[in-house]
Amino acid sequence: MINITRLFDFPYYQQEKFNIPGALVTKHNGVWEKTSSTEYINKANTISRALIRMNIQKDDKIAVISTNNRTEWNIMDIGILQTGAQNVPIYPTISEDDYEYILNHSGAIYCFVSDEEVLRKVNLIRDKVPSLKEVYTFNTIEGAKNWTELLELGKDQSNQDSVEDRKNNVKPEDLATIIYTSGTTGKPKGVMLSHHNIVSDVLSSSSRIPFEPGTSVALSFLPVCHIFERMILYLYQYYGVSIYFGESIDKISDNIKEVKPNVMSAVPRLLEKVYDKIYAKGTELTGIKKSLLFCAIDLGLKYEPYGANGAWY
């Protein structure tokens, strides 16, 4: 069994232990498209081969900016990390000035963006980032380079040995990513995290998993440029959970109905909004329906996860 010490070990562990048909699932043109554990690894290796042919070196920085979570982001993540380079995820909603600052501060050589709006913002400051060689898009946009060009460049497997050498030279203590703060108190701050930093978080979270390994389904919608959701995605991979990526925050309720996930991560404010909406709707009910709803709410308030609330709860 694979010993997980680097972030790119997670997909290989998943393939060896679970090999699920829907490791990563994204909706395209109204259809949920699945990428299996094996396809995930194969495409990540294709990206790694392409990046090496593009002269990416150990400790180079590659920025990835996406307005929503998607399969392509995860493939790029593993493909980048396997070369010994670092993935620099950036919030899609920040200003052009912050893009300029982060891309310069990190020294990003390439940038991958999701859509036309993000591309427009990056192009506005592109000439002010001397290190930036090229910008690629995930969506097909006229006149823009597309990430599929890397999939084509990496098709030739003749340099796969170079990928394996790069992987073998990545140590747990090596830098894996630089995650920038949102910049609400000044310039964004770059947080440097090693492979071990994140791997240890994933492995230590195993005692809290609320799902069945190998058979569960997750819905992912929190921004993966934040360390919480990113760590959770590796945790899902570790436990063979099929990850469905939500289309947008506005479509979460629709996606939940479609996907019927066993688990998803959320933040308190979102849960408060859902609770308030349910509660407000409940106050409009009458009779037995109202009694049943508020009985269920009261029961939920008494739920004690992991026995963590103490004897007086």
Residue map of PLM features:
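Conserved pre-ATP/AMP-binding loop-to-beta segment of ANL
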Residues: I20-G22, T137, K155-Y180, K187, ...
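Short beta-strand->loop structural element characteristic of the AMP-binding/adenylate-forming
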Residues: A63-I65, W73-D77, L81-E117, G190-M192, ...
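A short N-terminal helical cap/helix-turn-helix that marks the beginning
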Residues: I2-L24, N42
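Conserved AMP-binding/adenylation subdomain of ANL enzymes
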Residues: V199-S220, V224-W312
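Conserved structural elements of the adenylate-forming
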Residues: I41-T46, P172, V191-F211
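Conserved AMP-binding/adenylate-forming core of the ANL superfamily
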Residues: L24-T71, M76-I78, S95-E100, T148-K155, ...
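ANL superfamily adenylate-forming
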Residues: E117-P172, I278-Y313
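Conserved AMP-binding A3 loop
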Residues: K34-T38, A176-V202
